A protein has these predicted regions:
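HotDog/MaoC-like acyl-thioester-processing domains
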Residues: 12, 16-67
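Short, basic/aromatic beta-hairpin or loop at an interaction surface
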Residues: 1-4
Length: 67
């Protein structure tokens, strides 16, 4: 079973204007064993077309529990 465990860190380096073209990118930062499964940290970056900085950078946590 997979669970959204929350966020470690969320930043908004640049404003995203309405109508902007964006894209998301995910990168696995870490994976560690926890009781009954594994916890994975994924860094999600929202890029704005033509922007120098991303609109959002967030480290999300997911837990996968195995039975």
């Amino acid at each position: 079973m997979g669970l959204n465990y929350g966020c470690d860190r969320v930043r908004f380096p640049a404003a995203v204007r309405a109508g902007s073209r964006i894209r998301g990118r995910g990168e696995i930062v870490s994976a560690e064993a926890v009781a009954g499964g594994v916890q994975i940290k994924i860094r999600v970056t929202v890029e704005v077309e033509g922007g120098e900085k991303p609109g959002c950078v967030a480290d999300t946590l997911s837990r996968w529990l195995f039975q």
